[in-house]
């Protein structure tokens, strides 16, 4: 049986709540592109939640999405606090998840090696 700390459990609940907001189209800012919430790290005191997201697109689209998410922080914070039923409303920070792009880069390099070697 795996045991998870409270911040990990709350992070998973926050991730699900924000995913639900996105699925239901409640973030209507046109700057926010199609994003995927890849994870949430919550501080031990549950007062800060860093939300990691990924998206396809160029640097300008990423910057626009970040601005849209920053503008929606208050709304997201209220909705998350209500959905997760938290006593303290965590401050939300959005961060682009670079690991997805790095994984894509590694996959591309492996494909190139396979094609060169004839695997």
From Swiss-Prot:
The compartments listed are:
Cytoplasm
Primary location group: cytoplasm
Entry's Pfam families? RBFA
Q: Which UniProt keywords apply?
A: Cytoplasm, Ribosome biogenesis
Q: Which domain of life is it from?
A: Bacteria
Query: In the UniProt record, does the keyword Cytoplasm occur?
Result: yes
GO CC annotation: what is one?
Answer: cytosol
The GO terms this record gives for MF are: ribosomal small subunit binding
Q: Which GO terms describe its biological process?
A: maturation of SSU-rRNA
What the protein does comes down to: One of several proteins that assist in the late maturation steps of the functional core of the 30S ribosomal subunit. Associates with free 30S ribosomal subunits (but not with 30S subunits that are part of 70S ribosomes or polysomes). Required for efficient processing of 16S rRNA. May interact with the 5'-terminal helix region of 16S rRNA.
HAMAP family, sorted? RbfA
- Please describe the quaternary structure of this protein: Monomer. Binds 30S ribosomal subunits, but not 50S ribosomal subunits or 70S ribosomes.
Looking up NCBIfam families in the UniProt record yields: rbfA
Q: Which family does it belong to?
A: Belongs to the RbfA family.
UniProt protein name: Ribosome-binding factor A
Q: Which organism is it from?
A: Myxococcus xanthus (strain DK1622)
Q: What is the lineage of its organism?
A: Bacteria, Pseudomonadati, Myxococcota, Myxococcia, Myxococcales
């Amino acid at each position: 049986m795996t045991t998870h700390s409270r911040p990990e459990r709350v992070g998973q609940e926050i991730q699900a709540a924000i995913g639900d907001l996105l699925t239901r189209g409640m973030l209507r800012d046109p700057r926010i592109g199609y994003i995927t919430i890849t994870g949430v790290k919550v501080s031990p005191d549950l007062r800060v939640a860093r939300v990691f997201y990924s998206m396809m697109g160029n640097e300008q689209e990423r910057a626009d999405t970040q601005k849209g998410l920053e503008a929606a922080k208050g709304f997201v914070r209220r909705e998350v606090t209500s959905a997760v039923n938290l006593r303290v409303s965590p401050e939300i920070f959005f961060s682009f998840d670079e690991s997805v792009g790095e994984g894509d880069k590694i996959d591309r390099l492996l494909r190139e090696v396979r094609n060169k070697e004839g695997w």
